[in-house]
Amino acid sequence: MGQEQGTPWILSTGHISTQKGEDGQKTPKLEHHNSTQLMGHYQKTMNQVVMPKQIVY
């Protein structure tokens, strides 16, 4: 199930990257920031998803 949730996240990031791609110059810098933020968000999402699952089990 974790992979399924990861798919929409990647799609969302792609859309954001496309919008910021218009700037061009800011694209590289934003991409680096996005990578770091994405990792943090992914870890937080995973923790939140894992916690309720454990409680249900």
Swiss-Prot record:
Ranges of compositional bias, category Basic and acidic residues: 20-30
Subcellular localization(s) per the UniProt record: Host nucleus; Host cytoplasm, Host cytosol
GO cellular component, one term: membrane
UniProtKB keywords: Host cytoplasm, Host nucleus
Keyword Zinc tagged: no
Renumbered residue ranges of the record's region Disordered: 1-30
Family matches, as Pfam families: PB1-F2
Gene Ontology BP term (one): symbiont-mediated suppression of host cytoplasmic pattern recognition receptor signaling pathway via inhibition of MAVS activity
InterPro entries, per database record: Flu_proapoptotic_PB1-F2
The keyword Aminoacyl-tRNA synthetase belongs to this UniProt entry's keyword annotation: no
Additional free-text comment from the UniProt record: Is not encoded in all strains, and seems to be dispensable for replication.
Known role: May play an important role in promoting lung pathology in both primary viral infection and secondary bacterial infection.
Family: Belongs to the influenza viruses PB1-F2 family.
Protein name in UniProt: Protein PB1-F2
Native organism: Influenza A virus (strain A/Malaysia:Malaya/302/1954 H1N1)
